[in-house]
């Protein structure tokens, strides 16, 4: 369900869930780069905690969502404990869930949300963009140098 606010922004809560403080770091980085973000929160799993405590804190974030808000959860590691906790909660909550989150992808997701895309559209687009968020810098610089020197055979596309 795509519900727009009067400003044309989709009502969507995004919850970052990770091992340790990675999700907090993502949150702080986005605030530094994009400014304060409404309806963006984070939950981290720490060594002294069990999965049930993590699930409880994730569930608390889900319950903070407004009735008309979609919920998009972004986890750090496929089949990691945070991922598994969210999957278990998906039995009781209608949430979207992407895993393998990183800074460039999160930035794209937040920008898409701000441009009125719903969670389903964001998930589809994020999967397409994911491959572009990791770069081989050595190859990039080598190919860039080759382009500057007039080598037409370099493989870089940027």
Listing of model-derived features with the role each one plays in the protein:
Residues 2-72, 78-158:
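N-terminal loops that bind phosphate or other acidic moieties
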